[in-house]
């Protein structure tokens, strides 16, 4: 077998970078007499990118299609934020098979694909055990090693001479039950190549575990991975993607087609507010929506910009200041724990803390609706409306061992809840 595989991972909404990558992919395809495949290992989407955020990642799959992608696996940037139903939306617009074998049930995806004599399997990080049961989306995570072993066997029987795992598990992920290095070790002799993502590693010369080669192209479309297969030999390298690389016209043209669709959607007037649409307003909205006694909203989580002034609310400005992908939820919380949450959420250290889910923003103040914190009765329970950020341990306000078991309004996210409130 003589084959060139080009690969990317963790592009995270870098449209300009993807357009430059597409130019290199097209150039290599033109210059290379052998067959060339372009594969992506997930997380092309990004909530802080305008086109990606507004379309819940679908625009990025249209652009990846324009870049000439042959197959991609599902990452975690979109479905963890918007719910797994968006994966089917991505699959509908993608002009390549979207692969995901280890999470079930998910619509629109394939466990594997046979591209000529190359078998490709897709797996992604399940985050099993990281989130509470209430945020599992009803998805079951299958054990990756026996699953990939069986899929590889099936692909071999169907004629695959090379078996590639497009993996969003992470090259090294000590805190996770499985990563790419452990996958390669366990499946030596059954798979040939793992293209890694999720951990954003750049492996200039790749890695080898037994007979399995691992490759990863870093992040943000700054590099294009290149794998040369010549018989039994597999060579790995990465190609820098200079800023001066001209963008591919097909990617730019697709972005220009998407923009008017987005602008028309964003121009709609949703309703009016008679006071600033700020953290207090959102805490009130969450309390009312979830039929709760108390509403909580972390300002830096629900708003990424200045509050909207009183008056008409247009979708575009609303979405500009509310890029949160958190889901409204409700939980019963003891007065003692609620008091602790408010104390933490209003402490100077917590207010100034920057957490990764907020993409570098500070928490700012915890807003409280429907209750004077000084009047909390430690001996009773309160029904609290908030979002998963306030009600799950990764937000920093609650402890994992509290076992709150919130109920969430999936797949609605904060800005959609605001829209529904304004339209009533």
Where are these regions (language model features)?
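Acidic, metal/ion-coordinating pockets
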Residues: 1-243, 280, 285
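Short, well-ordered beta-to-alpha junction loops that form the rim of enzyme active sites
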Residues: 167-169, 298-301
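Glycine-/Pro-rich loop/turn segments that contact NAD(P) or position catalytic residues
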Residues: 294-295
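Catalytic centers of hydrolytic enzymes
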Residues: 8, 14, 221-276, 283-289, ...
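Flexible glycine-/small-residue-rich
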Residues: 122-125, 298, 386
